[in-house]
């Protein structure tokens, strides 16, 4: 296993959601620096009590859901990367030759926004809290894109938020992940290293396991009560002409194996499907195409993954992190 540096919670910027919502110029500058230099930052939610209350409510709902028998959960399997249930061990994991070891449940933003009737029962039964939470986080991330656009001097159709028009289809979704308790890693482990496919990811978890790759090696990203972890994805990196950093990360047990059930809530903001940008090879691709290719690559074997740069978004070469310098 790779050497992992000690916790680095003090090394990542902590930004105030309240100050960003208030369009504070200094906080917006710090936001740009964090997204360009680290690709990760902590977002202080402690002034937003309802958001934290809703998170705790959703966490309890999803714990009960994941505890249901597998055959019951498989009724929500849509064979989709944005909707429904997915069992453990469907993609390549952290250890060579072994699969991942997490299960997930996804709720599509398209479905919530359009109030479709085919929502899974657990969502339909608790629609008020799912709807309120997703819409608030969605608006927070669009606001963050707006602050980045403003600080970088981007105007009109060149603004980042213009690629996320409300009525257009998108791969955006709310995802819940459970890393089950294990006695051994022989059946799989963790979540393989990757960059996120979209624009911004909003993470909430009270448990350790998330790591990001730096020029010095792998570092823990410590959970902080009352804070979300936000990170830049490939699409935002490409839309920013590679000024902003989509950083490689993974999830691993803190010890030799997963000693307790670990839960994560993630909101993945992604551009509208037909948004176009230049990928790591300078080719014009749509956001939908990049998303689908990347998720197909998640399911490929480790040997196949080594022959393509898409999983790491072009941010790794010969297992070394590629660092891009940013001047404010």
Swiss-Prot record:
It comes from the Eukaryota. Residues 170-271 form the Fe2OG dioxygenase domain. 2-oxoglutarate binds at residue 262. Pneumocandin B0 is the starting molecule for the first semisynthetic echinocandin antifungal drug, caspofungin acetate. Pneumocandin B0 is a minor fermentation product, and its industrial production was achieved by a combination of extensive mutation and medium optimization. Inactivation of three of gloP/GLP450-1, gloO/GLP450-2, and gloM/GLOXY1 generates 13 different pneumocandin analogs that lack one, two, three, or four hydroxyl groups on 4R,5R-dihydroxy-ornithine and 3S,4S-dihydroxy-homotyrosine of the parent hexapeptide. One of its GO terms (biological process) is small molecule biosynthetic process. Gene3D superfamilies: B-lactam Antibiotic, Isopenicillin N Synthase, Chain. Fe cation binds at residues 194, 196, 249. GO terms for molecular function: dioxygenase activity; metal ion binding. Its cofactor is Fe(2+). 2-oxoglutarate-dependent dioxygenase; part of the gene cluster that mediates the biosynthesis of pneumocandins, lipohexapeptides of the echinocandin family that prevent fungal cell wall formation by non-competitive inhibition of beta-1,3-glucan synthase. The 10,12-dimethylmyristoyl side chain is synthesized by the reducing polyketide synthase gloL/GLPKS4. The thioesterase gloN/GLHYD exclusively interacts with gloL/GLPKS4 to maintain turnover of the polyketide side chain. Belongs to the iron/ascorbate-dependent oxidoreductase family. This is 2-oxoglutarate-dependent dioxygenase gloE. The lineage of its organism: Eukaryota, Fungi, Dikarya, Ascomycota, Pezizomycotina. The gene is gloE.
């Amino acid at each position: 296993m790779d050497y992992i540096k000690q916790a680095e919670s003090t090394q990542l910027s902590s930004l105030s959601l309240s100050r960003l919502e208030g369009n504070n110029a200094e906080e917006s500058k710090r936001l740009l620096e964090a997204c360009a230099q680290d690709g990760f930052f902590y977002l202080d939610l402690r002034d937003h009590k309802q958001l934290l209350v809703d998170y705790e409510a959703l966490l309890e709902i999803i714990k009960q859901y994941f505890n249901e028998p597998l055959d019951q959960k498989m009724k929500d399997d849509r064979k989709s990367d944005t909707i429904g249930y997915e069992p453990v061990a469907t993609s390549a994991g952290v250890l060579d030759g072994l699969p991942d070891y997490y299960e997930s449940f996804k709720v599509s933003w398209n479905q919530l926004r359009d109030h479709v009737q085919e929502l899974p029962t657990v969502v339909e039964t608790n629609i008020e809290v799912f709807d309120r939470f997703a819409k608030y986080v969605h608006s927070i991330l669009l606001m963050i894109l707006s602050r980045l656009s403003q600080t970088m001097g981007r105007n009109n159709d060149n603004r980042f938020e213009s690629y996320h028009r409300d009525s257009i289809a998108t791969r955006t979704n709310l995802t819940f992940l459970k890393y089950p308790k294990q006695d051994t890693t022989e059946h799989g482990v963790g979540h393989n290293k990757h960059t996120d496919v979209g624009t911004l990811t909003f993470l909430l978890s009270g448990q350790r396991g998330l790591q990001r790759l730096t020029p010095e090696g792998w570092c823990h990203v410590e959970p902080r009560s009352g804070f979300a972890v936000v990170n830049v994805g490939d699409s935002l990196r490409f839309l920013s002409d590679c000024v902003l950093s989509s950083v490689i990360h993974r999830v691993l047990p803190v010890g030799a194996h997963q000693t307790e059930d670990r839960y994560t809530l993630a909101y993945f903001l992604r551009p509208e499907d037909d948004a176009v940008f230049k990928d790591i090879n300078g080719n014009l691709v749509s956001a939908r195409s990049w998303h689908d290719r990347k998720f197909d690559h998640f399911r490929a074997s480790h040997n196949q993954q080594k022959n393509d740069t898409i999983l790491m978004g072009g941010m790794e070469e010969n297992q070394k992190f590629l660092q891009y310098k940013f001047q404010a």
